[in-house]
């Protein structure tokens, strides 16, 4: 069958610019993406040049994406559009820039990409290289373009090459034998010939198939001997960097290499897997070392960054232990796992959610389609190689309860807390291995889906973060605590702030810090349930409570306890007396007092009411708990050079020692709209609108006020209840008016 260089409609077919190669491939089709697998860019150039010149000679629009470090493939001034891009802006931004240029170029455009292998080097990730191709290739195909890509042979993992092979229309292996160049088509969609998949030698303008077995074996055996071994071919860019780091660390410790080499690799790995936020980079460079980063990798699933929550937890622990070695004994050992941010993007790409993700970068349409994308995320599947790593992690934890926590790139950084915007879910981790895996996968999906919630998207929009890379990593932590009957929970948990903004007495020192303390899981301290109380503890005056009155202990004490119900395999809230009834081994007197003892006055003999009241009195006065927390918060504040916000649990061991589990640390966020300031010393009387004396609950802030709205209380009270909501709506409309300058 002769090759015909026209389509069925009689129009001229696309071409590689090499008629002999067109004949081998049975011609190009609109939408073809051609990937050249080469040993070096010098083997890519002989195919790019004729493609470029043929396209321009035909009057085709030709676009060249220039982003790699190798020599330029398409020179300026010949009629091609050249887009110079930097992969260092991150996967999401880089991909958005490429797609925008493709959209603007329209249908039937011809493209040349620099070698894709440089993207893996800049992103430290073969996984993201595969993701880039999987979201870009179909887009080009739909627009009936013809596109050249290149990939360096034996530089990428099987998973990455497999993703590219499965997506492209044409994959060609290019190699040299002696002085001659060979092409070996490995995949050609919708075309076939008896000799298409043989190696072809290029000579005299034509490509001739090697069909004789003796010649084939001679050429291919020599080629195989020159290549790296099979084990090395399975390693991606990430693995190679980590192996190099481990080798350098060992040789530095042996005195074979200078310490400067370890420092340089540490800096690269820090940006590769921990953080690229400059303030956190500076902090991490001071408190972490290369061995810390290698330890992180051992407990990491996938590649990418570990996210803000993980960084805060690891940094805080390192700061404490290196400032005062006694904290190594005070802290509960953590054995957390980290799901890298690249897994999030991979999940979105492979479940068809990338288009919705891309649309979120538009400030006008970022909410459009978010709910549909969220539903798709909740029903998506994980790639097999990721699931296998999840299974191995769950085998490690056994049936110990775990918590799956959001740890996005921007979360818990300086200036962006994302408090409560992303989900974190407990997994009681009971049942068969398959049931536990299913529950864990559902939790990961829920965390990923929370990135598409309207609350999270509006928060990002309000803070100007819509066009920023916001990848979701995940922190998987063992839940701190112990089994008590059919329940699992820690003895105490809480939120600790190094600066106390709630000064309810002139005896309170704000710099001493404050703790919001609960019995059981810390969810009640973090979420502050409306139907219950937490214990507020000023760390310089722990017994001075904000509540007033003689009965302040029983009346304002915590009544319900958040626990994991192992028999029901779920999170639960139980009454304090019910929890105590199944927990006989607890050091109960540290946390609670009998209600009868508290209600009975001096000299009274009649029985008081039954049950227990959580007072924490002995914990606060007879143990080292308060001074330990005050020291912890002070050390972290000084290291951050900024107030900090922490989450922790604590358990007393049978020998009386207290172990603190520091699960989170981040810069203390100030409520939007102002900064913490010292109040002015003197304000003219005629400039005062409102004045109050006494303690101020919360932080002083300095804000620009556009307008003051006054609602007459008598007139408001006279309104029917059903009409009062209209006043609130009117105030909202006024507040949304443009600022007056």
Stretches with model-predicted labels:
Residues 58-123:
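Conserved inter-motif catalytic segment of the P-loop NTP-binding fold
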Residues 275, 280-283, 287-326, 381-741:
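Conserved mixed alpha/beta core segments that line enzyme active sites in large multi-domain catalysts
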Residues 122-123, 128-155:
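Substrate-engagement module of ASCE P-loop NTPases
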Residues 204-290, 299, 451, 507:
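Long, compositionally biased, glycine/small-hydrophobic-enriched stretches that function as flexible linkers
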Residues 1-8:
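Charged, amphipathic alpha-helical linker segments immediately N-terminal to NTP-binding catalytic cores
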Residues 13-67:
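Glycine-rich P-loop/Walker A and Walker A-like loops and their local beta1-loop-alpha1 context
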Residues 1, 151-207:
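Phosphate-binding/switch region of NTP-binding enzymes
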Residues 293-358, 364-366, 371-384:
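A conserved helix-loop-beta module that forms one wall/lid of the active-site cleft
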């Amino acid at each position: 069958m002769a090759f015909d260089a026209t389509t069925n409609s009689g129009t001229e077919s696309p071409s590689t610019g090499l008629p002999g190669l067109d004949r081998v491939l049975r011609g190009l089709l609109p939408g073809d993406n051609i990937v050249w697998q080469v040993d070096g860019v010098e083997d890519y150039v002989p195919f790019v040049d004729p493609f470029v010149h043929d396209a321009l000679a035909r009057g085709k629009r030709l676009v060249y994406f220039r982003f790699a470090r190798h020599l330029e493939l398409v020179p300026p001034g010949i009629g091609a559009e050249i887009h110079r891009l930097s992969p260092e802006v991150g996967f999401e931004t880089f991909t958005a820039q490429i797609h925008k240029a493709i959209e603007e170029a329209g249908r039937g455009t011809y493209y040349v990409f620099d070698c894709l292998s440089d993207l893996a080097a800049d992103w430290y990730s073969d996984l993201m290289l595969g993701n880039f191709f999987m979201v870009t290739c179909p887009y080009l195909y739909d627009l009936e373009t013809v596109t050249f890509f290149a990939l360096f042979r034996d530089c990428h993992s099987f998973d990455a090459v497999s993703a590219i092979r499965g997506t492209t229309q044409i994959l060609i292996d290019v190699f040299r034998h002696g002085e001659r160049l060979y092409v070996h088509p490995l995949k050609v969609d919708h075309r076939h010939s008896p000799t298409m998949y043989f190696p072809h030698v290029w000579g005299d303008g034509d490509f001739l198939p090697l069909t004789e077995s003796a010649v084939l074996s001679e050429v291919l055996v020599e080629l195989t001997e020159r290549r790296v071994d099979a084990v090395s071919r399975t390693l991606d860019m990430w693995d190679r960097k980590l192996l190099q780091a481990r080798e350098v660390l060992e040789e530095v410790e042996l005195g074979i290499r200078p310490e400067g080499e370890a420092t340089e690799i540490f800096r690269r790995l820090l940006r590769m897997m921990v953080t690229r936020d400059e303030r956190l980079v500076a902090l991490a460079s001071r408190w972490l070392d290369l061995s810390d980063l290698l330890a992180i990798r051992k407990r990491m699933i996938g590649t990418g960054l570990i996210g803000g929550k993980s960084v805060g937890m690891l940094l805080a622990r390192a700061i404490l232990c290196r400032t005062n070695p006694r904290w190594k004994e005070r802290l509960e050992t953590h054995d957390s796992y980290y799901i890298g941010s690249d897994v999030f993007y991979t999940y979105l790409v492979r479940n068809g959610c990338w288009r919705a993700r891309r649309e979120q970068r538009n400030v006008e349409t970022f909410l459009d389609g978010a709910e549909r994308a969220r539903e798709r995320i909740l029903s998506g599947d994980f790639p097999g190689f990721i699931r296998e790593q999840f299974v191995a992690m769950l085998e490690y934890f056994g049936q110990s309860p775990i918590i799956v926590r959001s740890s996005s790139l921007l979360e818990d950084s300086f200036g962006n807390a994302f408090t409560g915007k992303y989900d974190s879910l407990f997994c009681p981790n009971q049942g068969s291995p398959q049931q536990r895996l299913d529950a864990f996968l559902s939790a990961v999906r829920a965390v990923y889906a929370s990135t598409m919630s309207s609350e999270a998207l509006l928060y990002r929009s309000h803070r100007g973060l819509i066009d920023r890379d916001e990848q979701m990593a995940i922190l998987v932590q063992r839940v701190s605590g112990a089994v008590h009957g059919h329940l699992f929970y820690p003895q105490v948990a809480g939120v600790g702030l190094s600066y106390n903004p709630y000064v309810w007495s002139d005896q309170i020192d704000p710099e001493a810090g404050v703790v919001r303390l609960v019995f059981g899981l810390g969810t009640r301290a973090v979420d502050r349930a409306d139907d219950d109380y937490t214990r507020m503890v000023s760390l310089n005056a722990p017994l001075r409570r904000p509540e007033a009155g003689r009965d302040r202990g029983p009346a304002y004490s915590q009544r319900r306890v958040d626990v994991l119900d192992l028999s029901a395999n779920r999170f639960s809230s139980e009454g304090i007396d019910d929890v105590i009834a199944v927990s006989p081994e607890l050091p109960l007197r540290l946390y609670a007092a009998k209600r009868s003892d508290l209600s009975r006055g001096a000299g009274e003999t009649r029985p008081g009411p039954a049950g227990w009241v959580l007072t924490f009195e002995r914990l606060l006065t007879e143990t080292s708990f308060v001074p330990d927390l005050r020291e912890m918060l002070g050390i972290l504040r000084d290291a951050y050079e900024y107030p900090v916000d922490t989450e922790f649990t604590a358990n007393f061991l049978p020998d009386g020692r207290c172990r603190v589990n520091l699960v989170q640390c981040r810069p203390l966020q100030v409520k939007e709209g102002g900064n913490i300031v010292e109040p002015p010393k003197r304000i003219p009387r005629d400039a005062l609108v409102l004045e109050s004396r006494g303690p101020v609950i919360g932080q002083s802030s300095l804000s620009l006020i556009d307008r003051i709205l006054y609602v007459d209380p008598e007139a408001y009270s006279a309104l029917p209840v059903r009409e009062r909501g209209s006043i609130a709506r009117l105030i909202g409309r006024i507040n949304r008016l443009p600022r007056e300058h």
